[in-house]
Amino acid sequence: MPQNEYIERAQKLHGKRLDTEERARKKAAREGHKQSENAQNLRGLRAKLFAKERHAQKIQMRKAIKQHEERNVKGAPEEKDPSNPVPAYLLDRSNPTSAKALSSQIKSKRAEKAARFSVPIPKVKGISEEELFKVVKTGKKVHKKGWKRVVTKPTFVGPDFTRRPVKYERFIRPMGLRYKKANVTHPTLNVTVQLPILGVKKNPSNPLYTQLGVLSKGTIIEVNVSDLGMVTASGKIAWGRYAQITNNPENDGCLNAVLLV
């Protein structure tokens, strides 16, 4: 048993206190007073964080109440033989109950879609061009020609990449900063596997960084998951899946990512 589950272990060995339920009930009853006291007395950053948390809780509560109201409200009874017949394309509008059900279905689909495309790190600090690029001066008149740039962050370069002639190469990606594999963690299985990178899908800082294959924190990459044996809904073996980088590769010397499932 893990070390942090000593309470569960003690309860299994010796049982719970006789007044456990009573103490839990009293604690729940005091919760409202505690929140009221915090709302009145907290100051500064703690007050801001508390207000933000309460705001999110109230939004969820209002949504739940609205869903219950939509479920409980009964629509107008349907007429067996309406005096004014309605064409087929307007039948849904005449039935408020089905309209509410349809509205709830659309909302739930939107929520599922939002959850599907949610990422572990929604916000990251942007990277400026001064931080990413280092100016390289080349040519006979070195003091004039400073249009070349060396990328100072880790990058991914595909196997089919061919360098342009040195004279026309604007962006230089050093070999020592190129990554081909990432340590990808599966969120549900809690296993970490080293998988080859297939490409860079999106760098949140700049579209140019995506084109150059810059690997920074929060970047969405595509990895080869064929070794994991994952299958699609149709039963075919999944080849590539997206993952988000969770560390700073330039500081750690390795690439850690979480699989988006």
UniProtKB/Swiss-Prot annotation:
One cellular component (GO) term of this entry: preribosome, large subunit precursor
Keyword Ribonucleoprotein: yes
Pfam families: Ribosomal_S8e
Predominant location: nucleus
Biological process, per Gene Ontology: maturation of 5.8S rRNA; maturation of 5.8S rRNA from tricistronic rRNA transcript (SSU-rRNA, 5.8S rRNA, LSU-rRNA); maturation of LSU-rRNA; maturation of LSU-rRNA from tricistronic rRNA transcript (SSU-rRNA, 5.8S rRNA, LSU-rRNA)
PANTHER family, per the entry: RIBOSOME BIOGENESIS PROTEIN NSA2 HOMOLOG
Official protein name in the record: Ribosome biogenesis protein nsa2
Organism from which the protein derives: Neurospora crassa (strain ATCC 24698 / 74-OR23-1A / CBS 708.71 / DSM 1257 / FGSC 987)
Lineage: Eukaryota, Fungi, Dikarya, Ascomycota, Pezizomycotina
